[in-house]
Amino acid sequence: ELATRSDERLAELEAHDVLVLAVPLYNLGIPSQLKAWFDRILRAGKSFRYTENGPVGLLKGKRAIVLGARGGQYAGSALDTQTPHLRHMLGLIGINEVDTVFAEGLSMGDEHKEAALTTAHAEIEALIARL
């Protein structure tokens, strides 16, 4: 049954050119539900293969958009472990074109929250225009 669910998730991913992930920052990481999704799609021989030079992704020609929400400000700091983690997991399966838009500082007061959301919305609109 687990292999069937995994095959279904992989088929969904293979059927589309763009993957959009909406990802809150939970304790400097990704939500457990997203980790479980990655556990379903990261399969040797299906989404990547092992070679003498390391793993090679099999899902070519796809891109990902990561939309993130964060209570504090982490982008560009050592505490932003989420962005490299997602890039590594996506890269493992061959998705190396990854755009990110983060609304940061959402727990730092209403004024900061509104400014962050306005900026994120503008970045999303610009990203959509480029697709």
Model-based region annotation:
Residues 5-84:
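Helix-loop-strand module that forms the ligand-binding subsite of alpha/beta enzymes
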Residues 1-14, 120-127:
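Glycine-rich, highly charged phosphate/nucleotide-binding loops
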